Amino acid sequence: MIIPWQEIDQETLNNLMESIVLREGTDYGSQELSFETKVEQLKQRLKSGEAVIVYSELHESVDVVNKDSVTGNEPDGQ
């Protein structure tokens, strides 16, 4: 189920973004990014529509995924 980020309380959204970044672990890319930068990038992906927040009833978990990976899987076509 897609959860619109705009409907989530700002503090809750911040906590969710931080939790997801912490779950991702260490990034061994060519340039190490700060925790704050990673959180901000994740928020920007949501705001741009590139990513969406999804809740899995099966796993009772919340995650941020690319919008393309869930498009067409929602009952209302979102």
Swiss-Prot record:
It holds the Pfam family UPF0270. InterPro entries: UPF0270 (IPR010648), YehU-like_sf (IPR036685). Belongs to the UPF0270 family. This is UPF0270 protein IL0325. It comes from Idiomarina loihiensis (strain ATCC BAA-735 / DSM 15497 / L2-TR).
